[in-house]
């Protein structure tokens, strides 16, 4: 029976471990990565020491800390959105913010806590109650309120909750604006109702405007409620009254009944005229108005004096020599007689 042969191999130390991408993550440098996470989305944050867990949980209260592997590998799972309506609804650009000592900031600073806004918070109607009150106050931003009212007519939220919020908003706006349509939020509402351009929106416009007080109609709706003399005068013209009545051409179109608004659209513009009824601007906006002129000297804005034009043409025309013309005429006649 033969004996086996054993060979002793040289011993070598194993190669050092190569860290994975997850092991190289540092939760303290991931503020902008963690904050945008969607509901039930995991965000891997790398190895996390036990003594740092409480600090991370306090910084991200909307997330649940979960273990994902050996060596303290961890991840955060989004479970909620804790942003408040005043901080999320009064702007269309904010997705999250950091709160510290009662103050908020868009950038992280040590000791701050993350609060996130619900995705598409304006589209879902979650801001309706807050903005309805805020836009009637003294500190509202007119551009934000105008944009919010406009977005209400184009919401994609078809859930029962979203549709009910929209119905409630329309009802509250109709009640508020029927009392006084000059409130800024009501003027925006009427503007977007007009732009919506449906039979229902037209009926709501007319209903709201007809409910206005006598003082309101006298101040803002003289086109829609003309005097008897103005009505009698309108019988003399074939074109709609809205085309020549200054009370219509100078009126705020948001306060025109649908009939008057439509008639105004039938008018032909025969002069250069600009009328701005709704203008939303901020500190970065600029405005330029032009009537198609490249410079102020291209056309004269002074009324034409026809008599002066005729005199100018005569003065600069060629000088007629009547005696010379007479002699030439006689010469031509003589030549014709001789030739015959």
From Swiss-Prot:
Subunit structure: Interacts with OPG143. Component of the entry fusion complex (EFC) composed of OPG053, OPG076, OPG086, OPG094, OPG095, OPG099, OPG107, OPG143, OPG104, OPG147 and OPG155. Except for OPG095 and OPG053, each of the EFC proteins is required for assembly or stability of the complex.
Residue ranges, annotated region (Disordered): 1-20
Gene from which the chain derives: OPG094
Single GO cellular component term: virion membrane
Species in which this protein is naturally found: Variola virus (isolate Human/India/Ind3/1967)
Protein name from the UniProt record: Entry-fusion complex protein OPG094
InterPro entries, per the entry: Pox_virus_G9/A16
Transmembrane spans: 320-340
Lipidation (N-myristoyl glycine): 2
Subcellular localization, as worded in the UniProt entry: Virion membrane
Free-text function comment from the UniProt entry: Component of the entry fusion complex (EFC), which consists of 11 proteins. During cell infection, this complex mediates entry of the virion core into the host cytoplasm by a two-step mechanism consisting of lipid mixing of the viral and cellular membranes and subsequent pore formation.
């Amino acid at each position: 029976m033969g004996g086996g042969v054993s060979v002793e191999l040289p011993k070598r130390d194993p190669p050092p471990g190569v860290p994975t991408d997850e092991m190289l993550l540092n939760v303290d440098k991931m503020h902008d990565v963690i904050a945008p996470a969607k509901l039930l989305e995991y965000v891997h944050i790398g190895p996390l020491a036990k003594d740092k867990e409480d600090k991370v949980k306090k910084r991200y209260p909307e997330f649940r800390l979960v273990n994902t592997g050996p060596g303290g590998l961890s991840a955060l799972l989004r479970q909620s959105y804790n942003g408040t309506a005043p901080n999320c609804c009064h702007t269309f650009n904010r997705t999250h913010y950091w709160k510290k000592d009662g103050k908020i900031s868009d950038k992280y600073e040590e000791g701050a806590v993350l609060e996130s806004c619900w995705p598409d918070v304006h589209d879902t109607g979650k801001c309706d109650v807050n903005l309805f009150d805020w836009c009637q106050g003294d500190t509202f931003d007119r551009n934000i309120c105008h944009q919010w009212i406009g977005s209400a007519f184009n919401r994609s939220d078809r859930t029962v909750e979203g549709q009910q919020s929209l119905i409630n908003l329309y009802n509250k706006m109709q009640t508020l604006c029927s009392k006084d349509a000059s409130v800024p939020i009501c003027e925006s509402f009427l503007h977007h109702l007009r732009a919506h351009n449906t039979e229902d929106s037209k009926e709501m416009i007319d209903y709201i405007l007809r409910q206005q007080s006598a003082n309101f109609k006298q101040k803002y709706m003289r086109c829609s409620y003309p005097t008897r003399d103005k009505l009698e005068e309108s019988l003399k013209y074939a074109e709609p009254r809205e085309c020549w009545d200054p009370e219509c051409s100078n009126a705020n179109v948001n306060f025109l009944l649908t009939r008057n608004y439509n008639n105004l659209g039938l008018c032909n513009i025969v002069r250069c005229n600009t009328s701005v009824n709704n203008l939303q601007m901020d500190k970065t906006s600029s405005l330029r108005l032009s009537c198609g002129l490249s410079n102020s000297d291209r056309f004269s804005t002074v009324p034409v004096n026809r008599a002066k034009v005729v005199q100018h043409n005569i003065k600069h025309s060629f000088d007629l020599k009547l005696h010379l013309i007479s002699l030439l005429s006689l010469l031509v006649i003589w030549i014709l007689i001789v030739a015959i």
